[in-house]
Design a protein with these regions (language model features):
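Bacterial N-terminal signal peptides that target proteins for export
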Residues: 1-9
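Intrinsically disordered, low-complexity peptide-like regions
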Residues: 5, 21-22
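Bacterial N-terminal signal peptides
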Residues: 8-18
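Hydrophobic small-molecule pocket/channel-lining residues, especially in calycin-type beta-barrels
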Residues: 22-258
Length: 258
């Protein structure tokens, strides 16, 4: 679940010293076009003991007893698994008692398909709604298997705004998440900040050209994600292509200028 949260953890780095003016082409308000976007997700469930499971839903393995109680998870969060039957699980992640995300998992009758109603609570009180369908890619019983997404449906409006910052910098503003990220073009690693940010999280980036940014995310010096943001020649479309380290395929998000 952590990897499917929509974070705009960006900074831009520039080794050449060239400056972009305040009329940077990235500046503007951007809205996700779900019909042109493609999200690919992979998750793994293994048996770790009696009624105990090792989950890897992005970011690392968490071992959880499926008894409905909150148990220690990654990055200071807690995770609970509530079993609603052989074909139904509810997974809830919290931070400091506040629910961050909820995943309602359902198995098909033949056990080959998993649907996940993924809901992420935003800082402004709204809910990000995303429905995934997965196929089983390894043998297993019930939810125990490796699962790879085959389709997704975004049910929420996703918007963010890019503003100038200190001459050649940029500020990314995500209103629903109450996130304001100030980007400095110095080519150095910078710590991520915020209440829900994993410990040891950092990012660095560079401009490949005037229409493309490349950003690398790390946790404790380990690369977790590399992504590019590329503007179309007419500057009306912004395409984010993300390559999570634990995924074989890229996630592609297409935004249109408002």
């Amino acid at each position: 679940m952590p990897k499917r949260s929509f974070h705009w953890l960006l900074v831009a780095g520039l080794a050449t010293g060239t400056l972009w003016p305040s009329n940077d082409p990235f500046v503007g308000k951007w809205k996700l076009n779900p019909s042109k976007s493609k999200l690919t997700d992979r998750m793994k469930v293994e048996v770790a003991g009696p009624n105990k499971y090792a989950l890897d839903v992005g970011g690392g393995v968490e071992t959880i007893v499926a008894d409905g109680t909150d148990q220690p998870g990654l990055s200071g969060t807690t995770v609970s698994i509530t079993v609603g039957g052989p074909d139904a699980w509810k997974i809830v992640r919290k931070k400091d008692g506040r629910t961050l995300v909820t995943g309602t998992w359902m198995l098909s009758k033949d056990g080959q398909t998993l649907t996940d109603a993924f809901r992420a609570n935003q800082q402004d009180g709204s809910t990000l709604s995303l429905d995934y369908v997965y196929k089983r890619t390894t043998p297993g019983s019930g939810f125990v298997a490796t699962w790879e997404s085959t389709s997704e449906q975004m049910n929420s409006v996703v918007e963010f705004q890019i503003e100038p910052y200190q001459g050649d910098g940029l500020t990314f503003v995500t209103p629903a998440a109450h996130q304001t990220l100030k980007l400095i073009f110095d080519g150095k690693d910078h710590p991520n900040v915020g209440p829900d940010v994993p410990a040891g999280s950092a990012y660095s980036a560079r401009r490949l050209n005037e229409r493309t940014l490349e950003i690398t995310d790390k946790i404790k010096d380990k690369v977790t994600n590399t992504q590019q943001f590329e503007l179309s020649p007419d500057l009306k479309t912004l395409t984010q292509t993300a390559h999570p380290a634990d995924q074989g395929a890229a996630n592609i998000l297409v935004f249109e200028r408002e």
